Swiss-Prot record:
Its EC number is 4.2.2.10. Belongs to the polysaccharide lyase 1 family. Optimum temperature is 60 degrees Celsius. Retains more than 90% and 70% of activity after 30 minutes incubation at pH 6 at 50 and 60 degrees Celsius, respectively. Optimum pH is 8.0. Retains 70% of activity after 16 hours incubation in the pH range 4-11, at 37 degrees Celsius. Does not require calcium for activity. The lineage of its organism: Bacteria, Bacillati, Bacillota, Bacilli, Bacillales. Pfam families: Pectate_lyase_4 (PF00544). GO terms for cellular component: extracellular region. It comes from Bacillus subtilis. This is Pectin lyase. GO terms for molecular function: pectate lyase activity; pectin lyase activity. It is found in: Secreted.
């Protein structure tokens, strides 16, 4: 009896002394790097030199994020951490948080939204996983550099099961904001199983200036198993300079889907293009990149850029599914989830 009383007293003291979030765990997809594919994984560059896979905060401390201040405190630095959203995080105006390195930022099954939170890199950023998150922003935050996930430095980023929900827009309106930017020296990125929706401009990939040839070759990027819905232009994206493997994606309700611009090397395969393809808007080809498509539906035409000689099979192994399978899969499983994550391959 005395032993039991002593144990109970110690346990009660621990409840008082330990921080509440030690006992505030929430269910989240603690899947580590399961499902990782493409350039963010084990890959080679065009010279055959291998680089390590993205690991994020693997084996690091699990920290439950309850506020913007928590996010700012723990997303920076280089210590490996798995940061789990315990609450939806919201700000009344644009709030910028700088990304460090060796982090996994993951939404719980119940709480996964970042509203008006804008994540950006620095020279110390890299090896980061973003998973099971929903990005939302107010429509009035619509300037040219108002981009909720802005990656321009560092290597090894995996964006997986993330929803960029956008907002209503007018095609003739003045919105200039985008959903995602990857450019400058950011490199070795995979976007997978994610959903981009309801925005005038979608993704801008590669340095956004046709005269900055020092960025030729950046980024190496895999865009696979994603759902682009109601993006007026740039879904999958406007691409410059880098190597872009665009496979098994579904784009629907668009005016223009793939924009081929300065020195982009694009290998497209087995994508499904829905409403909008009948207007001939699948390819917006500036004639200044390199492009090849195989197996997409419907067949792509209006290509003016020369064929690319690059094939992503020289960088990593992968497999493809049919366009119809892709459409069915991503409409069911792409974006943030409230239950188990299902990965495309």
């Amino acid at each position: 009896m005395k032993r039991f009383c002593l144990w109970f007293a110690v346990f009660s003291l621990l409840l008082v002394l330990l921080p509440g979030k030690a006992f505030g765990a929430v269910d989240f997809p603690n899947t580590s790097t399961n499902g990782l594919l493409g350039f963010a994984g084990n890959a080679k560059n065009e010279k055959g030199i291998s680089k390590a896979s993205t690991t994020g905060g693997k084996n690091g401390q699990i920290v439950y994020i309850q506020s913007v201040n928590d996010l700012k405190t723990h997303l920076g630095g280089s210590t490996p951490k798995i940061l789990v959203l315990q609450n939806d995080i919201s700000a009344s105006s644009k709030t910028t948080v700088t990304i460090g390195s060796n982090k996994t930022l993951v939404g719980s099954y119940a709480k996964k939204t970042l509203k008006n939170i804008y994540l950006t890199t620095s020279s110390a950023s890299g090896n980061v996983i973003f998973q099971n998150l929903t990005f939302e922003h107010s429509p009035q935050i619509n300037g040219n550099n108002d981009i909720q996930l802005y990656l321009d430095s560092g290597i090894n980023y995996w964006i997986d099961h993330v929803t960029f929900s956008g907002h209503s827009y007018s095609a003739s309106g003045s919105d200039l904001d985008k959903l995602l930017y990857v450019g400058k020296s950011a490199d070795y990125i995979t976007i997978s199983n994610s959903k981009f929706a309801n925005h005038k401009y979608g993704l801008i990939l590669g340095y956004p200036d046709d005269s900055q040839h020092q960025y030729d070759g950046y980024p190496h990027m895999t865009i696979a198993n994603n759902y682009f819905e109601n993006l007026y232009v740039r879904g999958p994206g406007l691409m410059r300079y880098g190597y872009f493997h665009v496979k098994n994606n579904y784009s629907n309700n668009f005016n223009q889907a793939i924009t081929i611009a300065t020195k982009a090397k694009i290998y497209s395969e087995y994508n499904y293009f829905g409403k909008g393809s009948e207007k001939g808007g699948i390819l917006d080809d500036k004639g200044t990149g390199y492009f090849k498509d195989t197996g997409s539906y419907p067949s792509l035409n209006k290509q003016t850029s020369p064929l690319t000689s690059w094939n992503p099979g020289s960088n990593y192994s992968y497999r493809v599914q049919t366009p119809q399978y892709t459409k069915d899969f991503v409409t069911k499983y792409a974006g943030s989830q409230s239950t188990t994550l299902v990965f495309g391959y």
